[in-house]
Amino acid sequence: MEPFKHPIAILGAGSWGTALALVLARKGQKVRLWSYESDHVDEMQAEGVNNRYLPNYPFPETLKAYCDLKASLEGVTDILIVVPSFAFHEVITRMKPLIDAKTRIAWGTKGLAKGSRLLHEVVATELGQVPMAVISGPSLATEVAANLPTAVSLTSNNSQFSKDLIERLHGQRFRVYKNDDMIGVELCGSVKNILAIATGISDGLKLGSNARAALITRGLTEMGRLVSVFGGKQETLTGLAGLGDLVLTCTDNQSRNRRFGLALGEGVDKKEAQQTIGQAIEGLYNTDQVHALAQKHAIEMPLTFQVHRILHEDLDPQQAVQELLERSPKAE
């Protein structure tokens, strides 16, 4: 199948969904960008740009905004879901009666669904063993939209879908590397947001560069423990979806999770920090999901547990750091 002949639907018109839509449309592909907010769609249709979430990057002629989910999926084989993880299951449920046996599902969502479920498990439960794929890696939406060099991982349960999707996306400035570890890619994408909040808190408390480096490194260890328990591959940890995305999210202030942590470390109230950022903060939601998973399987994840206590038990960030520093020394 020649993938470029068929339109692709992108469900989710936030900054990341829009950036991916631009990558595809700039290659001449027909792209349908769906948002559930009718006023947002009206704005995009009238202005030819997503001024709410990704301003300054005009839509190519082949990129159209939709609010009607049925219309956005009509005649479409490939669907790319880019909504916050807490909305992922709902979107799958809504699209279920609107798709057919030829449908192939990919997502750029990073996180776990309600009940600490991996996103591919949600898709399999609702839709069966359809061709599915995950796109992940260090990819700030504004830099992708600006056509700055970016590299991501793509993993799929279907070799033809993987080949077609890579052909759709890959270019000189947006490089796509094939990966065969869906579990590892999904778990890395979930944990890195939590660790970005942790490093943001540390920097907000002015604990220094040494502390930031230690948090990233020990955070990678936590990530590895989780991936190992669920059968993911250790190689994924040092790849784009693991270390690559972790370093970017923990160190760049374009990261919403890092900015959220910075605000908390500087003493800003949680709700106020959320309102200031104005878009979904995946780590805020996924801390709860990953924490539950770690508890259930007795996985040692002290950084994740302390972030959870800060977010959900009102633990003072300074106290959380002090408790981590008082932990008994152990082998690396």
From Swiss-Prot:
Signal peptide: none annotated. Keywords: Cytoplasm, Lipid biosynthesis, Lipid metabolism, NAD, NADP, Nucleotide-binding, Oxidoreductase, Phospholipid biosynthesis, Phospholipid metabolism. PROSITE patterns: NAD_G3PDH. Its EC number is 1.1.1.94. It is found in: Cytoplasm. It catalyses: sn-glycerol 3-phosphate + NAD(+) = dihydroxyacetone phosphate + NADH + H(+); sn-glycerol 3-phosphate + NADP(+) = dihydroxyacetone phosphate + NADPH + H(+). It comes from the Bacteria. This is Glycerol-3-phosphate dehydrogenase [NAD(P)+]. The lineage of its organism: Bacteria, Pseudomonadati, Pseudomonadota, Gammaproteobacteria, Legionellales.
